């Protein structure tokens, strides 16, 4: 999902609720699946966040956050789809596509 969207691994921060977006009138939304949406800047194309509203999931693109102090890279998703060309050195929780979809209760994956 993220690799095809951005050409490489995507880094996001799970929001506690729906993302509070300043300048929402500049945001376009692409429905990428039955349950998921990609939100991006309609002016420059920057990836802003990914949402699965029915599951209450909002992943904010890390590059859009001014201060990442105190945040840690803890989880890799879609690990079964990861290409062999890279591997992260730090220990992380690794979720397959099926495990991630079940975690966010995506329709059809209950």
Where are these regions (language model features)?
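A short Gly-Trp-Pro
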Residues: 1-110
């Amino acid at each position: 999902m993220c690799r095809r969207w951005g050409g490489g691994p995507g880094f996001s921060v799970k929001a506690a609720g729906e993302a509070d977006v300043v300048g929402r009138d500049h945001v376009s939304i692409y429905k990428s699946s039955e349950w998921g949406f990609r939100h991006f800047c309609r002016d420059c194309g920057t990836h802003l966040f990914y949402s699965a509203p029915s599951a209450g999931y909002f992943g904010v693109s890390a590059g859009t956050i001014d201060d990442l102090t105190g945040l840690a890279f803890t989880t890799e998703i879609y690990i079964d789809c990861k290409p062999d060309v890279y591997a992260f050195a730090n220990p992380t929780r690794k979720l397959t596509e099926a495990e991630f979809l079940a975690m966010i209760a995506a329709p059809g994956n209950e």
